[in-house]
Amino acid sequence: MAIVERILIRATANGPSVELDRAAVAPGAAIAGDRYANGSGTFYEAGKDGQDVTLVEAEALEATGLSAEDSGRNVVTRGIGLNDLVGKRFRIGAVELRGNRLCEPCATLRDRTGVFRELVGRGGLRADVLVAGEIAAGDEIEEL
């Protein structure tokens, strides 16, 4: 069974991560309180797809030794291959999303953590919210 292990946000690109038990998400809005919701994300571009939610596999973090907080991703998953969700619809709890593109590691992550090459092809997924709702730690993830 694929699940959400953790939900994290950052108010600013280099600020500390804050863990949430649950989070409201809506199309084009990102997670309330996250840097992409307030337009201050490193790669923020108004109206650009793939900025609502970022996901990363717990298994990839464990293999590289990178913490969920340092990854900068919003949702840590377990038991699902996120690369397989590019271009596909999936559900977390009652929220429907579409995998937009891979969330490859960037220079900001490399400079902050020293991790780069190890996450190429394993850096996670950028997703668009299609149906608003709430996601929570422990929610099941299901491909539609």
Specify the residue positions occupied by each region the protein language model found.
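Electropositive, beta-rich accessory/interaction domains or terminal extensions
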Residues: 1-96, 101-102, 132-134, 144
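Membrane-targeting and insertion segments and their boundary/processing signals
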Residues: 35-38, 108-112
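Acidic/glycine-rich phosphate/pyrophosphate-binding loops and surrounding catalytic core
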Residues: 97-98, 117-134, 140-144
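Short, basic/aromatic beta-hairpin or loop at an interaction surface
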Residues: 64-74, 109-124
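Well-ordered mid-protein domain cores that form the structural environment of catalytic cofactors
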Residues: 103-107
